[in-house]
Amino acid sequence: GDPGIGKSTLLLQVCRILADKKKVLYISGEESQTQIKLRANRMGNFADGLFLLCETNLEIIRGILEKERPELVVIDSIQTMYSEEVSSAPGSVSQVRESTNVFMQLAKGLCIPIFLSDM
């Protein structure tokens, strides 16, 4: 969807609801934890099962997912993610392709749903 139409807010609202019963990890490559918490708090209480991570490095994210084993992951947004193994800039076709492939492998390997948002 177009920038600014509320994709991030909608995803965060879904995460808040699901985090009442599940361990949910919301990964942002665009906003700080403070910004995300402020937005989440405007929607209501911040759920205990909702965890925030502000990171864009795929290798770091992979390690966290393998260690923490969340039950649901949201990536906001896929264009900000990058792999050190790909020489192009974040947001490039090759980086988005690599990021998508890594998250697909993680979803299958860890048996968890991973939602990918674009800018």
Language-model-detected regions and their locations in the chain:
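Conserved inter-motif catalytic segment of the P-loop NTP-binding fold
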Residues: 2-5, 9-108
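A short helix->loop->beta-strand "cap" motif at the edges of active sites that frequently abuts
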Residues: 110-112
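Conserved H-loop
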Residues: 119
